[in-house]
């Protein structure tokens, strides 16, 4: 990576949503129902498969305006290299596509009228875990699901109604499964299921504060590094030591963080431009102006960051302003990422920003 903070993208490709890297130079991206293989260096590309869109999905996917309104994108993709399989959420379903057999399945419809999930975790044994992200509060349990090698989906753990609102993130570390929940203080938890044993109650590592509300976390040297998703107070990059149980804020950032990518000794992430909030005297949410001083959203730009674990250094790589369209209907402004990394390149997707629906490729290879 170049020593200066801001880096200019190597290339720009409109409407191409990056999904995963097949190798360090070959990217799979999604566009209008197609998975397309694109070699960054030769510029060769070819269609490798299709999502079977319904007539309604085809019509709504045709225009960027309606794609955004109905969230017709690939969310939370995971690539299983051994099986040549991409699993992801799309339009209210847990889906899978096999690059080798070209088979596409809508395996499981999400409950609670959910359009997507925020996190899918592929474990070392091939099992997949994901948590529900309800769109509506229907007074039912919010669940963690396990999807096995036979594509069977079963509930492994239930949060009772009213306990949490969303499951933000799930990941594996040392054979344990970690679950991160939100949104309000009493709903914000970081849990550990030891050896993925769901018969016993999980360990509660952190809970009860917006400082523990996160959608992006990475384990490094027995510490959890995580970014906060906090619309009320200043956001930051934190570390939590699993042994000492000490929490330390390492850096402040300009907004809530929902998307990130762990790449070797680096963590790439982006801030989001969403509603900036405070609580009134009745503990109700009140929207406030983005002024750089109050609330959790301190900038009307989405900022692309890189954190270097070895150097304990944070760099700003790019900034793009949120577009003029409604957050409620057309989404928060942010950069999205692939599900895995290339040692040479970083692929990002601009969402609800002034340069919208754009694949941006950056050179991140060390000098």
Which positions does each model-derived feature cover?
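Repeated scaffold domains used in trafficking and secretory/extracellular systems
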Residues: 12-24, 57-81, 112-122, 163-169, ...
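Entry beta-strands of beta-propeller and related beta-repeat scaffolds
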Residues: 25-27, 84-87, 126-130, 176-178, ...
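Loop/turn-rich, solvent-exposed surfaces of beta-rich toroidal or solenoidal domains
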Residues: 223-235, 251-325, 329-333
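Blade-level signature of beta-propeller repeat domains, shared across WD40, Kelch, NHL, RCC1
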Residues: 332-367
